[in-house]
Every structure is written in C-alpha cells, then in structure tokens.
UniProtKB/Swiss-Prot annotation:
The active site is at residues 73, 112. This is N-alpha-acetyltransferase 50. Disulfide bonds: none annotated. GO terms for cellular component: cytoplasm; cytosol; NatA complex; nucleus. GO terms for biological process: establishment of mitotic sister chromatid cohesion; mitotic sister chromatid cohesion; mitotic sister chromatid cohesion, centromeric; N-terminal protein amino acid acetylation. Substrate binds at residues 31, 75. InterPro entries: Acyl_CoA_acyltransferase, GNAT_dom, N-term/lysine_N-AcTrnsfr. CoA binds at residues 79-90, 117-126. Residues 6-155 form the N-acetyltransferase domain.
Length: 170
C-alpha cells in the first residue's frame, strides 16, 4: 500500500465552502461571514489540509498588533476526528511556525483553547506553547465557557521586556 499523503492547499473562493463545512463539524462555535471573507485575504496564513486528496482539516490565522507586539493569532486549527493523530495538525502548525520564522518579526503566536480540550492543550504544549491566562466566559453558548490563552514566544526577550505579562499556572 502506498504511503498516505498529507498536503496543504490554499483557501480560495472555489473551496471556501469546504472550509465552512469542516469548521462546522470540527468546532463547537460557529464563524460568521466576515471570518470567511477575512480568511480569503490572509494568503499563506490559511490552509486546507488534505489527506490522500480529501479535505480533512484547516488552519486559519491572522496578524494581530496588540500589547505593542506583532503577534500571530491562530483563529482555528482543526482536523476531522477520524483523521486525528496522523500528523495533520503537526503539519499545519509547522507551516504556521515556519511562516513566523521566515518573517522574523513576530514576537509570539497565540490562540484560545476551551479549558476542557486537554488533547489540544497537550498538542500545543509539545510545540512550546504555554498557558499564559484563562479567560472567563470567553465562549458563548458552549460549556465550559472558559478558555485558556496559549502562547509561544518567538523572540528572545531582553530582561525587563514582557515583565507585565502575568504567567498563571493551572
């Protein structure tokens, strides 16, 4: 049997419906039309993941200038349940990390994860992400509503820089 192929492809107006469908199945939250309109504008920061030519997952990010930093925000990164633990999430996250590395100007990369999603938390921790805070009632209409903010620092900060970021251990 031939080895399985995992490939990443661009999100385009022709396949945006596939992305919508994947997100509806994978995530307990729904995304509005503006989300999908914005995704079409971010180029390499949004990718569909294919397993043997079947769209099974996606990653969508955006550049965020907050806290006087240039940050990459992972809006969504997910894969259909039957295709998990095959390296698809790793391929998507590595794609995003490589973009940040090549760019060289990002301070950090961050995302929100539902506090009950232990497999996602473990996944991101393997890549050097840390829980930096927990936001109460972050999600609407899903339980638990709280979200961890996971962050991976990309720049070696000089002493004193980022001293205002509170680390919370959970």
């Amino acid at each position: 049997m031939k080895g399985s192929r995992i490939e990443l492809g661009d999100v385009t107006p022709h396949n945006i419906k596939q992305l919508k469908r994947l997100n509806q199945v994978i995530f307990p939250v729904s995304y509005n039309d503006k989300f999908y309109k914005d995704v079409l504008e971010v180029g390499e920061l949004a990718k569909l993941a294919y397993f043997n030519d079947i769209a099974v997952g996606a990653v969508c990010c955006r550049v965020d200038h907050s806290q006087n930093q240039k940050r990459l925000y992972i809006m969504t990164l997910g894969c259909l349940a039957p295709y998990r633990r095959l390296g698809i999430g790793t391929k998507m996250l590595n794609h995003v990390l490589n973009i940040c590395e090549k760019d060289g100007t990002f301070d950090n990369i961050y995302l929100h994860v539902q506090i009950s999603n232990e497999s996602a938390i473990d996944f991101y921790r393997k890549f050097g992400f840390e829980i930096i805070e927990t936001k109460k009632n972050y999600y609407k209409r899903i339980e638990p509503a709280d979200a961890h903010v996971l962050q991976k620092n990309l720049k070696i900060s000089s002493p004193g820089q980022n001293a205002d970021v509170q680390k919370s251990e959970n």
